[in-house]
């Protein structure tokens, strides 16, 4: 589910990711992928929270990443202003030359994140 994160006057598309779901990517002609993630803060959460994401390469775990984040004061989700995005956190993965499918999943039950994928050549 794409969501528009508003930062000042700029709108950036992120994809909502809930526990139990995976977002898949099939990069072509790239050397590196950067996954940007922002935790969705809702009312009962404190100002600082932790979360974990796991990156898969085909059916093999590529890596598990643990993040600590805090609420962002200058960004909102256009489609749901009650949800406050956290400050962005990222992980980079190096890609092999052959074709692979990469996916990312959230490991924390009861939480959701917004994910964006950037490719580098």
Task: Please state what every model-predicted region is.
Residues 10, 18-20, 30, 97-100, ...:
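Tight coil/turn sites that cap or link beta-strands
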Residues 1-27, 41-45, 66, 72-83, ...:
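Glycan-recognition and processing domains
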Residues 25-35, 59-65:
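Conserved long hydrophobic alpha-helices within structured protein cores
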């Amino acid at each position: 589910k794409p969501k528009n994160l508003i930062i000042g006057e700029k709108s950036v598309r992120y994809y909502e990711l809930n526990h139990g779901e995976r977002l898949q990517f099939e990069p072509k002609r790239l050397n590196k992928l950067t996954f940007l993630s922002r935790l969705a803060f809702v009312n009962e959460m404190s100002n600082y929270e932790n979360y974990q994401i796991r990156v898969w390469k085909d059916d093999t775990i590529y890596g598990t990443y643990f993040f600590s984040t805090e609420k962002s004061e200058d960004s909102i989700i256009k489609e749901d202003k009650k949800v406050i995005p956290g400050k962005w956190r990222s992980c980079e993965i190096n890609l092999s030359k052959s074709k692979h499918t990469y996916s990312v999943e959230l490991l924390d039950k009861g939480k959701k994140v917004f994910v964006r994928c950037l490719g580098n050549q």
